[in-house]
Amino acid sequence: MRKITLIMFTLLICAAQQVKAQTDSMLIRPTVDKRVELLSIIFRLTGNPEYNRNDFKLYTDRIESHFSPYKNHELISFARSLVKTDGVSYDAVMSMAINLDNQFNLPADYGSLDSRWNRNQVGPFIKLLKKFVKDSRFDAFYHSNENLYQEAVSRFMPIYKSIDTQWYNDFYGQKSNDRFHIILSMSNGPGNYGPSVTDKENIHNVFSVMGAWVTDSVGMVVYPPELILPILIHEFNHSFINFDPEMFRTSGEQIYAAVGEQMARQALSLIHI
């Protein structure tokens, strides 16, 4: 009897560990992403207010020092025209970032890309982006800040370890097959974004791009849990509640008509609701 009990207990432990492994695999370890840093810098140089925060001054001063000579680069001029004519800003910028690969190529099928990106302008933008990367020595800048990036990730890890992805499954009564990513954005102040992309393996990848707006006595970014955790929970909730937005389009349009002005000030158009 003792032997049977021991076997059953061992099986229960193994099953629990398997469940934990499956849920933990939903949540990817936080990182600083060079695609996000590059696009943030580009739209800082265009003059977009939301990408011109200096809350993490230790880092943004380095950006200004390195990239100021390129404010009139042909890419920046082209990007300014996209801001003016198509409203490329806020989360549209981050949508482009996560759709790129690590060589800054855009896949042939980029259906997840935000609709504010004019499909006729995407090719020229990518071509100029690659030229900007080379001309501005972006890779050298990124590598020179790797210690800062690693320290930021280290400071974020306690929050990452406290996230219980199984809670979502239990609360909503359904399992999401999405993969959740946390990207630490170093220059965007309190700007936080939640873009998503479906990859070639048909896995839906949900991103929480977290800004940096609180620093310690020496100017290094910190991540107070009481500020950060609610934002993460909010962003990842979308994966469970945004299954069929068309069901609510009519009522959403009626509500938006009453509050549209206030929502627009928060960079939320009807499509974001």
Task: Please identify what each model-predicted range represents.
Residues 1-25:
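Bacterial Sec-dependent N-terminal signal peptides
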Residues 194-226:
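Active-site scaffold of zinc-dependent metalloenzymes
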Residues 226-247:
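Active-site recognition of the HExxH zinc-binding catalytic motif
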